[in-house]
Regions:
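Active-site beta-strand->loop->alpha-helix modules in alpha/beta enzyme cores, enriched
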Residues: 1-40, 44-169, 196, 213, ...
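A conserved mid-domain beta-alpha-beta active-site/ligand-binding segment of alpha/beta enzyme cores
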Residues: 177-178, 182-202, 206-220
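Short, well-ordered beta-strand micro-motif
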Residues: 183, 234-236
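Carbohydrate-associated surface elements
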Residues: 173
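Amphipathic alpha-helical coiled-coil segments
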Residues: 221-225
Length: 256
C-alpha cells in the first residue's frame, strides 16, 4: 500500500506546474450579495475591498452582524454603550459604500456556541428572505469560536437549500485554502480608511497594518508588474465535502 501511495504522489508531483497561482474571481454585476460577519468590522477585514468592487458593479449587498459586540472593549477605553458604539461604526462605514440598513442579530459576543439552534434559525430566515446569488462568510479554519459557529450555521443552511448559491469563505484569524483571489489594489486605500473608522478594536490590535500585510502577501499571487505592490483578498469556495470533513474532524477531536 505504501508503495502504491508513493507512486501516486510521484505521478502527481511530476505533473504539477512550477508555480500555480489561484484563479482571479470574476465578480458579478447587479446580483444579490449576502455577507455574514460574526462581529462588527469582520466584514471589512475579510472582504471589504471585494464588497467595494461589488457595490461598484451595482450589486445589492446585505450585511448581517451576528454578535452584539459587548466583549469588544474589555479594558473600557470607551465610556459609553459599547454595543451601540460598535453598531454605529458599522453603519457609518457601510454607509460610505451606500450599503444601508445592516442587520444586527445581537447574539452574545463570544457566546454563539451556546445559542446554535437560535443562530441557525436566524441565519436561515435572513438567508431565505434575501434570496442571495452570492454569500460570504467566515471559514471553518478560524481560530475564533464565534467565527467557526457562523461558518457552521451558514454552510449547513446552504446545504439544505441545495447549494444553489456561490458560498465563499473569507479569512480573518485563520488561513484558508485559497481557491480565488480578488485584486483590491484599486480600493486598498479605501479599505484602510474604513478599517481606521472602527475605533474600539484599534485600541487592542493594529488591524489596519494587519490587513495591509495580509493583502500584500496575497497580492504576491496577482499577475502584474512584480516591482509594483499589489493587494488581494483571498477566498475559499466552500464545497459540501468541506462541511462534512470539518464536522467529522471535530467529532474525532472530541473522541480523542
Amino acid at each position: 500500500m505504501n508503495r502504491f501511495i508513493d507512486w501516486l504522489w510521484v505521478r502527481r508531483l511530476r505533473r504539477l506546474p512550477h508555480f500555480r497561482s489561484p484563479k482571479m474571481l470574476g465578480l458579478p454585476q447587479k446580483q444579490r450579495v449576502l455577507v455574514f460577519a460574526p462581529h462588527s468590522d469582520d466584514e471589512w477585514i475579510g472582504c471589504g475591498g471585494t464588497l467595494s468592487l461589488l457595490k461598484a458593479n451595482q450589486c445589492e449587498i446585505r450585511v448581517v452582524v451576528l454578535s452584539d459586540g459587548a466583549q469588544g472593549d474589555p479594558s473600557h477605553f470607551f465610556e459609553g454603550d459599547v454595543k451601540k458604539k460598535r453598531q454605529s461604526e458599522t453603519r457609518e462605514v457601510l454607509g460610505v459604500l451606500g450599503i444601508d440598513d445592516p442587520c444586527f442579530l445581537n447574539f452574545p459576543d463570544g457566546g454563539l456556541a451556546e445559542h446554535l439552534a437560535d443562530l441557525r434559525r436566524a441565519v436561515a430566515q435572513i438567508y431565505d428572505e434575501f434570496a442571495p446569488d452570492w454569500v460570504f462568510t467566515t471559514s471553518f479554519t478560524e481560530h475564533h469560536r464565534d467565527h467557526v459557529c457562523v461558518a457552521y450555521a451558514v454552510a449547513h443552511h446552504w446545504l439544505s437549500r441545495g447549494r444553489r448559491e456561490r458560498l465563499l469563505a473569507y479569512e480573518i484569524y485563520g488561513s484558508i485554502r485559497v481557491d480565488w483571489l480578488v485584486d483590491i489594489t484599486s480600493v486598498m486605500a479605501l479599505k484602510r480608511d474604513m478599517i481606521r473608522r472602527y475605533e474600539i478594536p484599534l485600541h487592542y490590535v493594529d488591524y489596519e497594518a494587519a490587513c495591509v500585510s495580509v493583502a500584500q502577501f496575497r497580492g504576491i499571487l496577482v499577475a502584474g508588474d512584480p516591482l509594483e505592490a499589489s493587494f488581494a483578498e483571498a477566498f475559499m469556495e466552500i464545497k459540501p465535502l468541506d462541511v462534512w470533513l470539518d464536522v467529522f474532524g471535530r467529532a474525532m477531536d472530541r473522541v480523542g
